[in-house]
C-alpha cells in the first residue's frame, strides 16, 4: 500500500492536476479523527487529498503464520556426543559414570569401550557442564573407580588398599571422600567425617605475626630508620626489598614463634552425628601441655552429645553406650 501511495505522489499527472487548480487562498480545517480523508501538503499553498485504505488480514492467516514459529524447538547441544533428541540426553551423573567406566576399562581391563574422539567429546562436555570429575587428581579418580568396581562386583583394590587410599585423600583434604553422619550395621556405630579447619589454623599465627612486625619496626627504629629508607627507594628496588626480603623475614619469624609455642598442632571440624551441628577440636601441644593424643572427647555445643574425635582416622564416633 505504501509503494502505491508513493508512486501516486510522484506521478506527473497528479502534479499537473494540482497546478491547474491552485488553492492559494484555501485553508481547510483539520480533519476529524473519524474522517477517512487525509490532507497532505506538498508545497506552500498546494495540498492534495488522499483516500486512506485499511486492509484487514483474516485471523486464520495470522494464526497459521505464528503457529510454526512458536513451536520451533532449538536444541542447545552442540557437541557430537550429545543427542539431538532431548528425551535421550544424558544427565551429568550418567556422563560422569560413563567417563569413569571408560577410564576403568582402559587402565585396568585393557579394553577401550569408546573411541578417542568419543572420549574427548565426553570429557569436553563434562568440562563445559562444570563437572569436577574431569578435574580430579589421579588418586581421586582411582578412588572413584575402585568404588564403582566394588559396587559392580569386580573389586580392583583390597580392603586395606582402599582404606589407605581413602585416608590419604582425607588427609589431603579431598571432598570426594567426605560423608555426612552415617550408621554402620557391621560395627553398630554412628560415624561422621572430620576435615581440617584451615582458617582457624591460620588464625593461630596472628599473635606471632604481630610480634614479628613489632620486632621488625623495633629493628628499624634502632638502626635510624634505615629499613624505611631502603623501602622508599625508587622502583624496582623498593619492590624487590619489600617482597623478597622484608616480607619473607616477617613470615619466617611468625612461623618460628608459633612453632616454638604450639607444636604439632591440628584443628579438625566435623558435624555432630546426632544433630549435625559443626564442632571443632584442637590437637597438639601448647608449651609442653598436650591436648590428649590422637583422640579427643568433645561435647556438642547444641545437643550436648559426647563425641570422640580421632585425628588418625579422621572420624567422629560416639562412645560406647551412647545413643544418637
Curated annotation (Swiss-Prot):
InterPro entries (alphabetical): PGRL1
Signal sequence segment: none
Effect of residue 82 to S: Loss of photosynthetic cyclic electron flow, loss of formation of oxidized monomer, and decreased FCC binding and dimer formation with PGR5. Loss of dimerization
Extent of the transit peptide: 1-60
Stromal side: 61-198, 258-324
Disulfide-bond pairs as recorded: 82-183
Induction: Up-regulated by drought stress.
Entry PTM: Disulfide bonds; Cys-300 and Cys-303 are probably involved in the formation of disulfide bridges with 'Cys-11' and 'Cys-105' of PGR5 while Cys-272 and Cys-275 are probably involved in the binding of a Fe-containing cofactor (FCC).
Keyword Protein transport assigned: no
Residue ranges of the region described as Disordered: 16-42
UniProt GO cellular component terms: chloroplast; chloroplast thylakoid; chloroplast thylakoid membrane; cytosol; thylakoid
Principal subcellular localisation of the protein: plastid
Record annotation: effect of changing residue 272 to S: Loss of photosynthetic cyclic electron flow, loss of FCC binding, but no effect on dimer formation with PGR5. Loss of dimer formation with PGR5
Record topology, Lumenal, thylakoid segments: 220-236
Listed GO biological process terms: photosynthetic electron transport in photosystem I
Disruption phenotype: No visible phenotype; due to the redundancy with PGRL1B. Pgrl1a and pgrl1b double mutant grows slowly and has pale green leaves.
Alphabetized GO MF terms: identical protein binding; oxidoreductase activity, acting on iron-sulfur proteins as donors; protein domain specific binding
Transmembrane portions of the chain: 199-219, 237-257
Subcellular location, record wording: Plastid, Chloroplast thylakoid membrane
Protein topology in the membrane: Multi-pass membrane protein
Domain comment quoted from the record: The C-terminal loop (258-324) is required for ferredoxin binding.
UniProt subunit comment: Homodimer and heterodimer with PGR5. Interacts with PGR5, FD2, petC, psaD1, LFNR1 and LFNR2. Also interacts with a Fe-containing cofactor (FCC).
Note: Thioredoxins prevent homodimerization.
UniProt family annotation: Belongs to the PGR5 family.
Protein role: Ferredoxin-plastoquinone reductase involved in cyclic electron flow (CEF) around photosystem I. The homodimer is probably not involved in CEF.
Protein name from the UniProt record: PGR5-like protein 1A, chloroplastic
Lineage: Eukaryota, Viridiplantae, Streptophyta, Embryophyta, Tracheophyta
Amino acid at each position: 500500500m505504501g509503494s502505491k501511495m508513493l508512486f501516486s505522489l510522484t506521478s506527473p499527472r497528479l502534479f499537473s492536476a494540482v497546478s491547474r487548480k491552485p488553492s492559494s487562498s484555501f485553508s481547510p480545517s483539520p480533519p476529524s479523527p473519524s474522517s477517512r480523508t487525509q490532507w497532505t501538503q506538498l508545497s506552500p499553498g498546494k495540498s492534495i487529498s488522499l483516500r486512506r485504505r485499511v486492509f484487514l488480514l483474516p485471523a486464520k492467516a495470522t494464526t497459521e503464520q505464528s503457529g510454526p514459529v512458536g513451536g520451533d524447538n532449538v536444541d542447545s547441544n552442540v557437541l557430537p556426543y550429545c543427542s539431538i533428541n532431548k528425551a535421550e540426553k544424558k544427565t551429568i551423573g550418567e556422563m560422569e559414570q560413563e567417563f569413569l567406566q571408560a577410564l576403568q576399562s582402559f587402565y585396568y581391563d585393557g579394553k577401550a569401550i569408546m573411541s578417542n574422539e568419543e572420549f574427548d567429546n565426553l570429557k569436553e562436555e563434562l568440562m563445559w557442564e562444570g563437572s569436577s570429575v574431569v578435574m580430579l587428581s589421579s588418586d581421586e579418580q582411582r578412588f572413584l573407580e575402585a568404588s564403582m568396581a566394588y559396587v559392580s562386583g569386580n573389586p580392583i583394590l583390597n580392603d586395606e588398599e582402599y582404606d589407605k587410599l581413602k585416608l590419604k585423600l582425607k588427609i589431603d583434604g579431598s571432598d570426594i571422600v567426605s560423608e555426612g553422619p552415617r550408621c554402620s550395621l557391621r560395627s553398630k556405630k554412628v560415624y561422621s567425617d572430620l576435615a581440617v579447619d584451615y582458617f582457624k589454623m591460620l588464625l593461630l599465627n596472628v599473635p606471632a605475626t604481630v610480634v614479628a612486625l613489632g620486632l621488625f619496626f623495633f629493628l628499624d627504629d634502632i638502626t635510624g630508620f634505615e629499613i624505611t629508607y631502603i623501602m622508599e627507594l625508587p622502583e624496582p628496588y623498593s619492590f624487590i626489598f619489600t617482597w623478597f626480603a622484608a616480607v619473607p623475614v616477617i613470615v619466617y619469624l611468625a612461623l618460628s614463634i608459633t612453632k616454638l609455642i604450639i607444636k604439632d598442632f591440628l584443628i579438625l571440624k566435623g558435624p555432630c552425628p546426632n544433630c549435625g551441628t559443626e564442632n571443632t577440636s584442637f590437637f597438639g601441644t601448647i608449651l609442653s601441655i598436650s591436648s590428649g593424643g590422637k583422640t579427643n572427647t568433645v561435647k556438642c555445643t547444641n545437643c550436648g552429645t559426647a563425641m570422640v574425635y580421632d585425628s588418625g582416622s579422621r572420624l567422629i564416633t560416639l562412645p560406647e553406650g551412647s545413643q544418637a
